[in-house]
Amino acid sequence: MASLREATLRKLRRFSELRGKPVAAGEFWDVVAITAADEKQELAYKQQLSEKLKKRELPLGVQYHVFPDPAGTKIGNGGSTLCSLECLESLCGDKWNSLKVLLIHSGGYSQRLPNASALGKIFTALPLGEPIYQMLELKLAMYVDFPSNMRPGVLVTCADDIELYSVGDSEYIAFDQPGFTALAHPSSLAVGTTHGVFVLHSDSSLQHGDLEYRQCYQFLHKPTIENMHRFNAVHRQRSFGQQNLSGGDTDCLPLHTEYVYTDSLFYMDHKSAKKLLDFYKSEGPLNCEIDAYGDFLQALGPGATAEYTRNTSHVTKEESQLLDMRQKIFHLLKGTPLNVVVLNNSRFYHIGTLQEYLLHFTSDSALKTELGLQSIAFSVSPSVPERSSGTACVIHSIVDSGCCVAPGSVVEYSRLGPEVSIGENCIISSSVIAKTVVPAYSFLCSLSVKINGHLKYSTMVFGMQDNLKNSVKTLEDIKALQFFGVCFLSCLDIWNLKATEKLFSGNKMNLSLWTACIFPVCSSLSESATASLGMLSAVRNHSPFNLSDFNLLSIQEMLVYKDVQDMLAYREHIFLEISSNKNQSDLEKS
């Protein structure tokens, strides 16, 4: 049995061989499609894909597309899937029935991982590879074996998760059955409450191994532990070793414990995709949020019932049309088989929050070992200190030898001078800092913005524990918001700002740190970081810092005004400097 590490390395090597080269027919995906929240995000994604192809960082001869959600009501990843199928048909015509498509859901503005907000979760940098792998390349690498063992259809996945698996030397994952096929990972019951859980047909004749092909009787979406037992989704640990029963976001399950099989990606054959597309065309524009997992997969398998269509506990916004739409999807898909590829030696990781990001990149996590993540990845940097609790992580950055980055912190796409000290558990992204002490648990991310045709810079800063999504309805309630653990109203006093409606961008219905216009606009990256760190320092020291002299933006506005081309040019400048430094270093060694 190959270890996860060996299996993962083989996939990375295989993908590396395909980067920058034309792929043979059937060897790779025909289409790689990424969803976007809106046209602004679509443009940002297209610009980055174009740069990647120019630099030959992706396999060539593949159609790379970005499909934005239509303006208006949020439609969820299920709605995005339906829109994407329509886009595919309009782009490819009748040919789409012979295509193998990878569809990656990456719409949304990553409020829980704001360093991915400007350029997208699928373009999150990883401490791996030269040039640096982003989540897109990792997805393509981890799925590199799939297309050659797949019938035409669509594989649906999310931008912020990682699936690692190992199967026997002569085994492979095949997506060749009619209907839907999903991957399943053994996980604790606690993990099951936040995922989809498969109720499998019992098969006493089955030989248990790393890879099993099973039929799903019923799919449960984020079930309670009580319901997992009630619907017979719970298994007892078998003889295949402790290391296999680890959901990546959890510790290893102890022996003789209970576990469930949880979901990750799923595939639908062309016939099923066409059925969904025809349904979407007949329904017209969507006016409610559809979940690709909760609303599609729960309709599948012989045990599916319409009961879930009335459960709205996992819906962010209950539209009047939602229940009706769920009923229609249930009747459309009922009777469609759900095949399950059980991967007993696999892990599933989620990197969609600041805490998960720091955990996997800086601590001694299983993902770090299995993926070969580095502490210093494609950077000019002094060695970083290590402690039992973890290490710092430096990605695509230039860090002066006199700079100190504490364990537990991540620095990406940044330039740090000799008199900079970064505290523990910080994230510093796309920033230029010449001289300062950044306190522990700080988040700092700089953006290029174009306002009235002028290129400027703004840096968002806040505490790692701050909740950007937490919102209030009225100005009287903004005292409930916190900035770096301090009452937001007190912060406004320190910054000489008044709590008026003008302080917030957007519809004024949801007042939050996300929509608060508190971040200075400056003429350079370094000035921008200095100004934002000044406002943070003032709050920590309870000393005045006059923000009323600055033009101010909210994070929401930064994303509207962002200048993607300038941000990519800045990264390229760092890339060239690192490459030059490495070449010089290699010459000196030889």
From Swiss-Prot:
One of its GO terms (cellular component) is cytoplasm. It catalyses: beta-L-fucose 1-phosphate + GTP + H(+) = GDP-beta-L-fucose + diphosphate. It is an enzyme of class 2 (transferase). Pfam families: Fucose_pyrophosphorylase. InterPro entries: Fucose-1-phosphate_GuaTrfase, GDP_fucose_pyrophosphorylase, Trimer_LpxA-like_sf. Its main location: cytoplasm. The keyword Kinase does not apply. GO terms for biological process: GDP-L-fucose salvage; L-fucose metabolic process. Gene3D superfamilies: Hexapeptide repeat proteins. GO terms for molecular function: fucose-1-phosphate guanylyltransferase activity; GTP binding. Keywords: Cytoplasm, GTP-binding, Nucleotide-binding, Nucleotidyltransferase, Transferase. Its EC number is 2.7.7.30. Expressed at highest levels in brain, moderately in testis, ovary and kidney, and weakly in liver, spleen, heart and lung. It is found in: Cytoplasm. PANTHER family: FUCOSE-1-PHOSPHATE GUANYLYLTRANSFERASE (PTHR15045:SF1). Catalyzes the formation of GDP-L-fucose from GTP and L-fucose-1-phosphate. Functions as a salvage pathway to reutilize L-fucose arising from the turnover of glycoproteins and glycolipids. This is Fucose-1-phosphate guanylyltransferase. The gene is Fpgt.
